[in-house]
Amino acid sequence: MTAPTTMTFFERFETDILSGKKTITIRDESERNYQPGSVVEVSTLEQGRVFCNLKIISVEPILFYDLGEFHAQQENMTLDVLKDVIQDIYPGISQLYVVSYELV
């Protein structure tokens, strides 16, 4: 499968990404093919507005129940909020992927 060259985020996460407070994203199986070392163009999900480029550092599988405070800190939110957000986006999911990145 070809590695993706784009990534989208809800607009509400843009400021945290640009400030470096949000350094991971947690995605489902359909978005697990990002390649470490690649650079992706990032846009808002709502309007498709490009706002930065990110270098992918790693893509690691994780189960929903294994998410912890460290992941929440990297997402710049509390663990309870992180779990609620994930359940809103991916209801009932157990297998997830942590995509680590840095702003370029």
From Swiss-Prot:
It catalyses: N(4)-acetylcytidine + H2O = cytidine + acetate + H(+); N(4)-acetyl-2'-deoxycytidine + H2O = 2'-deoxycytidine + acetate + H(+); N(4)-acetylcytosine + H2O = cytosine + acetate + H(+). It holds the Pfam family ASCH. Belongs to the N(4)-acetylcytidine amidohydrolase family. GO terms for cellular component: cytosol. Catalyzes the hydrolysis of N(4)-acetylcytidine (ac4C). Gene3D superfamilies: Hypothetical protein. Residues 7-95 form the ASCH domain. This is N(4)-acetylcytidine amidohydrolase. Keywords: Hydrolase. Its EC number is 3.5.1.135.
